[in-house]
Amino acid sequence: MAFMVKSMVGGQLKNLTGSLGGGEDKGDGDKSAAEAQGMSREEYEEYQKQLVEEKMERDAQFTQRKAERATLRSHFRDKYRLPKNETDESQIQLAGGDVELPRELAKMIEEDTEEEEDKASVLGQLASLPGLDLSSLKDKAQTTLGDLKQSAEKCHIM
C-alpha cells in the first residue's frame, strides 16, 4: 500500500520540483551527458559511434536470420506447392537476395529429400522389374481379399 502511495505521489512531486527547481540552461546535451558518464567529449563521441556500429551489426544479423527463415519457408512452399508469400520474398531481397540456409536446416532438408528419393526409387524399381506384372499382382490381391471376406462370413464364431 505504501508503495502505491509513494509511486503516485512521488512522481507528481518530482514533476513539481523539477519545474520549479532549475532556472539553469543545460547548454550542450552531449557535453552534459559526457560529463555525467565521467568521459571527455571525444571519448563520449567514440562511445556513441561504437554503439551505432554495434546496433547496425545486430540489425544486419537479425535481417540475415529473418531471410534464412523466409528462405526455408519458401523452400517448403515450393516443395508442397503452396502459394508464395510476398513478405518472405521481400525479406530475402532485403538481405541481398542470395541467402544460404544454416547448416542444421540444410541438413534436415537434405535428409528429407534423400528419404523421398529412396521411396521413389524403390517404387520405381518395382515397376521396372521385367518379370513382375503389376496388374496380375493386383488381381491376385483382390481375389485373396475376396476369399478372406467369404471365409469370415462363413465363420460361426463371428
Swiss-Prot record:
Binds to the SNARE core complex containing SNAP25, VAMP2 and STX1A. Farnesylation mediates presynaptic targeting. The modification Cysteine methyl ester is found at residue 155. Its main location: other. GO terms for molecular function: neurotransmitter transmembrane transporter activity; SNARE binding; syntaxin binding. This is Complexin-3. Belongs to the complexin/synaphin family. CDD domains: Complexin_NTD_CPLX_III_IV. One of its GO terms (cellular component) is cytosol. Residues 156-158 form a propeptide. A lipid is attached at residue 155 (S-farnesyl cysteine). Pfam families: Synaphin. It is found in: Synapse; Cell membrane. Complexin that regulates SNARE protein complex-mediated synaptic vesicle fusion. Required for the maintenance of synaptic ultrastructure in the adult retina. Positively regulates synaptic transmission through synaptic vesicle availability and exocytosis of neurotransmitters at photoreceptor ribbon synapses in the retina. Suppresses tonic photoreceptor activity and baseline 'noise' by suppression of Ca(2+) vesicle tonic release and the facilitation of evoked synchronous and asynchronous Ca(2+) vesicle release. Residues 14-47 are annotated as: Disordered. Gene3D superfamilies: Single Helix bin (1.20.5.580).
